[in-house]
Amino acid sequence: MTTTEAPSALSFECETGNYHTFCPISCVAWLYQKIEDSFFLVIGTKTCGYFLQNAMGVMIFAEPRYAMAELEEGDISAQLNDFAELKRLCTQIKRDRNPSVIVWIGTCTTEIIKMDLEGLAPKLEAEIGIPIVVARANGLDYAFTQGEDTVLAAMPARCPEAATSEADQQERTNAIQRLLQFGKSPAAEQQPASSKHPPLILFGSVPDPVATQLTIELAKQGITVSGWLPAKRYTELPVIAEGSYAIGLNPFLSRTATTLMRRRKCKVIGAPFPIGPDGSRAWIEKICSVLEIEPQGLAEREAQVWDSIEDYRQLVEGKQVFFMGDNLWEISLARFLVRCGMRCPEIGIPYLDRRYLGAELAMLEATCQSMGVPLPRLVEKPDNYNQLQRIEALQPDLVITGMAHANPLEARGISTKWSVEFTFAQIHGFGNARAILELVTRPLRRNLALGTLGGSQWVSEAVTSR
């Protein structure tokens, strides 16, 4: 893996607290929409079903492409035949929806009762004739967004090692190019000719507009994206040959990166993630460096974006932001916000893979030094009680936290922002830097508006009276 060692100047701690995050089975919310010909079957209890129903807000009559296989007492006491029950459900799914793949999502309960999903899946797959992918997205071992990591880590084994024919290879290579040229006139500005370079796979689930933007940015450098993991359709999974290059888009995909390296012999590129203009430039430059391509116009592109968000930078400059830790985006967001002029005393994060995040950690340290602000304290698996004491002492201008702690902090007069909003928003690439700052500054702009109306005095009096 081409990466950067974690710098020693940063302070790393582990408080061994519990995961205070969304359940990782919530990855179904975006993955079932991303993989259009899939069906997700979550195998769990009523609690899992209630969570999915409430968290996703999709009514059952909308016929979403996911469902619950609800475990009962007979399953837990081994009185029922797991294979027969799952076969009945999957046969019904095949008859009603006919997906190209069924993804079984394991939960805490399947982990506790040691249900052998990996052993059952191949037998059932052979009987019903539909691929079955098993992902253990349980909340005992994984945090919020790591559910996506478990699903994507199971996908490389299903990717072809080589195109079935030369025509198929040409079809896969030109698919994205046809998408980019759709609706353009012949007189439209032409992109530089693609350089001859090894195959490049991008892994990480992002909305289609973001995927298009990143593909265009790479095409400007003469780089062709060979495929995406996950693909829009299971039948279009990318060819992953030995020696292919792969680079992640999200900081919580360390298991997927490891699988690509060990199982498919890919060369995983370690780079800062494309968050903010600084991260987007570093991400593209690292790809160009590995592929031995001279980057063109990135400094100008970055400067242009910084100019366009200057109004938001003035709002956050000098402010202090505290990350409690929820979705593993904390380090990338902190690095971008420090570059915007904020100070960050502490970054809490549920899980920290220093190898996969090595380049991001190095850039965080360099950014803090260039901006002349103290290095943040990084706390893995933070203890929320201790964190609340530190927040009380620091009194930061903004706390980015999970939903469970937002209202209690607001009641104490501390402005908060839900971290889950960054998970579902479009935040990658040059074009979405403004969207990040719009989310971050919303509580700050609200406070300014309340101050203008005299509302801040009412809030402070209410807090003091408590």
UniProtKB/Swiss-Prot annotation:
CC cofactor: [4Fe-4S] cluster
GO-annotated molecular function: 4 iron, 4 sulfur cluster binding; ATP binding; metal ion binding; oxidoreductase activity, acting on iron-sulfur proteins as donors; oxidoreductase activity, acting on the CH-CH group of donors, iron-sulfur protein as acceptor
Function: Component of the dark-operative protochlorophyllide reductase (DPOR) that uses Mg-ATP and reduced ferredoxin to reduce ring D of protochlorophyllide (Pchlide) to form chlorophyllide a (Chlide). This reaction is light-independent. The NB-protein (ChlN-ChlB) is the catalytic component of the complex.
UniProt similarity note: Belongs to the BchN/ChlN family.
Assigned keywords, A-Z: 4Fe-4S, ATP-binding, Chlorophyll biosynthesis, Iron, Iron-sulfur, Metal-binding, Nucleotide-binding, Oxidoreductase, Photosynthesis
Cofactor note: Binds 1 [4Fe-4S] cluster per heterodimer. The cluster is bound at the heterodimer interface by residues from both subunits.
Coiled coil: none
Record-listed E.C. numbers: 1.3.7.7
InterPro entries cross-referenced by the UniProt entry: LIPOR_BchN/ChlN, Nase/OxRdtase_comp1, Protochl_reductN
GO biological processes: light-independent chlorophyll biosynthetic process; photosynthesis, dark reaction
Catalysed transformations (reactions): chlorophyllide a + oxidized 2[4Fe-4S]-[ferredoxin] + 2 ADP + 2 phosphate = protochlorophyllide a + reduced 2[4Fe-4S]-[ferredoxin] + 2 ATP + 2 H2O
Name used for this protein in its record: Light-independent protochlorophyllide reductase subunit N
Binding site for [4Fe-4S] cluster: C23, C48, C108
NCBIfam families in alphabetical order: DPOR_bchN (TIGR01279), PRK02842.1 (NF002768)
Top EC group: oxidoreductase
Organism expressing this protein natively: Synechococcus sp. (strain ATCC 27144 / PCC 6301 / SAUG 1402/1)
Pathway given in the UniProt record: Porphyrin-containing compound metabolism; chlorophyll biosynthesis (light-independent)
ATP-binding is among the record's keywords: yes
Designated gene of the protein: chlN
Oligomer status and interactors: Protochlorophyllide reductase is composed of three subunits; ChlL, ChlN and ChlB. Forms a heterotetramer of two ChlB and two ChlN subunits.
Gene3D superfamilies associated with the record: Nitrogenase molybdenum iron protein domain
